[in-house]
Amino acid sequence: MYGDHRQIWERIVEVIKSELTPTSYNTWLVHIKPLAIIDDVLFLSTPNTFTKNIINGRYINIIYDAASKATNKLYEIKILSEDEEEYREIKESIEKENLTESTTLSTLNPKYTFDTFVVGNSNKLAHAACLAVAQAPAKAYNPLFIYGGVGLGKTHLMHAIGHFINKHQSGYKIMYVTSETFTNELVNSIKDDKNEEFRNKYRNIDVLLIDDIQFIAKKERTQEEFFHTFNTLYEANKQIVISSDRPPKEIPTLEERLRSRFEWGLIADIQPPDYETRIAILKKKAQTENLNIPDEVLAYVAEKIQSNIRELEGALIRIVAFSNLTKANIDLELAKHALKEIVSNKTREITVKLIQEEVCKYYNIKLEDFRSRKRTKNIAYPRQIAMYLARELTDLSLPKIGEEFGKDHTTVIHAYEKISNEIKQDELLSRQIEELKKRIKGY
């Protein structure tokens, strides 16, 4: 029922702009929005009847001619104002169809909208970029790459983009998927000989929202397939939004051709929320859940839980659950009692084993390989970084650190001096070390 009216209107606008002065276009025609194509009738909308009458009186023939030139087809043009019943009927019909389409393509969390996202200094660039993408898919930033640690709101923003487009745009096919799901579906398509079906699913959409892209590192076939999916969508002027726990340059074993494409658009980071933002997040959560939480309790939680939004909200839920179970009112003493285990665990003990595990996770290598005698660069270099961090973050002696790695103390000295010197010259390595320190310390 509905044609690809947005792309057709974009082509028509290019012709119109070449034939009108900027003043004429920006005064009247800029307000026109494509609504739908139904049985070769191109429905356009204007904000009010006055604008509609001006366009019908002065510019309708220009629009007809431009449509013919741009499409080599004779469309009937019908302009509706947004206060007309016919406009509302078509809009409602489109929204119903979009809702059906979007739910078959992917499931979006109804709680993850722009309205429920708390904006602060730590995330305002990412929020603004996501909103711009949602308002004008494939026109603002394409691709948009957002990165940050676990629980900071990346997935929330991606779902918010999907919800906003569903609500405000017509006819868009939106796909939200994690890179793990993408990989699993690819594996199944190969196993079941359904490659073409898989490609059609991911390449015949308008917006691709792919979460946790770092997990495709080391998966050569997945990277190959995603490379071609990316190219197909990008060349068709479709919006791509990617999230990761780190910027493209820091994703190990990511193919350079993918890395460069991820950097074509805008890269926006999300940092852990500052104190004021943590307070705002807690107040928003309390408001959403209809909870009456004293300000001093919110302040205590915001002071003690600094790592991410997920832990902040989890702490608040824990306090409420504790209150319900003990039949006690929520006050500062109850909050301290409810969170005593969480707060005490924040000062985690840093061991060499913990450092090894975090470094392995960060560089996507197996712990058994890390502790083996393998000397390949992708294992030896992270091992040297782990030795450096063990020297920096623990009070262990050099021989003891060496023993934890199955090496002697001279190897630890060499690793420490090497990484110390490289940090001074390599900004990327310096950022990686700082990120690893945060992860090891638990915030």
Swiss-Prot record:
InterPro entries: AAA+_ATPase, Chromosome_initiator_DnaA, Chromosome_initiator_DnaA-like, Chromosome_initiator_DnaA_CS, DnaA_C, DnaA_dom, DnaA_N_dom, DnaA_N_sf. ATP binds at G151, G153, K154, T155. Its main location: cytoplasm. GO terms for cellular component: cytoplasm; plasma membrane. Domain I is involved in oligomerization and binding regulators, domain II is flexibile and of varying length in different bacteria, domain III forms the AAA+ region, while domain IV binds dsDNA. Plays an essential role in the initiation and regulation of chromosomal replication. ATP-DnaA binds to the origin of replication (oriC) to initiate formation of the DNA replication initiation complex once per cell cycle. Binds the DnaA box (a 9 base pair repeat at the origin) and separates the double-stranded (ds)DNA. Forms a right-handed helical filament on oriC DNA; dsDNA binds to the exterior of the filament while single-stranded (ss)DNA is stabiized in the filament's interior. One of its GO terms (molecular function) is ATP binding. One of its GO terms (biological process) is DNA replication initiation. This is Chromosomal replication initiator protein DnaA. Residues 73-106 are annotated as: Domain II. Keywords: ATP-binding, Cytoplasm, DNA replication, DNA-binding, Lipid-binding, Nucleotide-binding. It comes from Thermoanaerobacter pseudethanolicus (strain ATCC 33223 / 39E). Residues 324-443 are annotated as: Domain IV, binds dsDNA. Disulfide bonds: none annotated. Oligomerizes as a right-handed, spiral filament on DNA at oriC. Signal peptide: none annotated. It is found in: Cytoplasm. Residues 1-73 are annotated as: Domain I, interacts with DnaA modulators. Residues 107-323 are annotated as: Domain III, AAA+ region. Belongs to the DnaA family.
